[in-house]
Swiss-Prot record:
Gene expressing this chain: rpsG
GO biological process: translation
NCBIfam families with a match to the protein in the record: rpsG_bact
Organism: Parabacteroides distasonis (strain ATCC 8503 / DSM 20701 / CIP 104284 / JCM 5825 / NCTC 11152)
Gene Ontology CC annotation, any one: small ribosomal subunit
Protein name per Swiss-Prot or TrEMBL: Small ribosomal subunit protein uS7
Pfam family, one: Ribosomal_S7
GO molecular function, one term: rRNA binding
Subunit field text: Part of the 30S ribosomal subunit. Contacts proteins S9 and S11.
Record bears the keyword Transmembrane helix: no
């Protein structure tokens, strides 16, 4: 095990919105250190989202943040071994981990989608998440369902 907890890295805000959350998302989206490409994908996806939801009074960034909130899980199950049996113990998730899980799920399910470009797939997944639909939202619902089903083992807290 580690001796000390590692220091959090300082993440700079993105150039367009000045938001650290956007940079964190783009870092998850990025392949092979190609951050500019990842930023282009993200910004074009947000433009497409605004085009798909023209009568929405929110900005594209607010829609993206609302979509992330919709797919953010509150509880997860962790395996815990007690006397030869393994139990799925529901535990609350730390705020930074919640954010990380929701971002990763949005990207994973966007990549699995059918579509021409990654920007199109990402925008479609953002719109679905905003409307409480799609693969990422279903993943959150499944996590909550698993935690609810295993609530009897909550006393095995970590």
């Amino acid at each position: 095990m580690r001796k000390a907890k590692p220091k959090k890295r300082q993440i700079l805000p993105d150039p367009v919105f000045g938001d650290v959350k956007v940079t964190r998302f783009v870092n998850h989206l990025m392949y092979d250190g190609k951050k500019n490409t990842a930023f282009e994908i993200f910004y074009s996806a947000l433009e497409t989202v605004k085009g798909k939801l023209p009568n929405e009074e929110k900005s594209a960034l607010e829609i993206w943040k609302a979509a992330l909130d919709n797919i953010t899980p509150q509880v997860e199950v962790k395996s815990r071994r007690v006397g030869g049996a393994t139990f799925q113990v529901p535990t609350e998730i730390r705020p930074d981990r919640k954010e990380s899980i929701s971002m990763k799920n949005l990207i994973i399910f966007a990549r699995k989608r059918g579509g021409k470009t990654m920007a199109d797939k990402l925008s479609a997944e953002i719109v679905d998440a905003f409307n409480n639909q799609g693969g990422a939202f279903k993943r959150k619902e499944d996590m909550h369902r698993m935690a609810e089903a295993n609530r009897a083992f909550a006393h095995f807290r970590f």
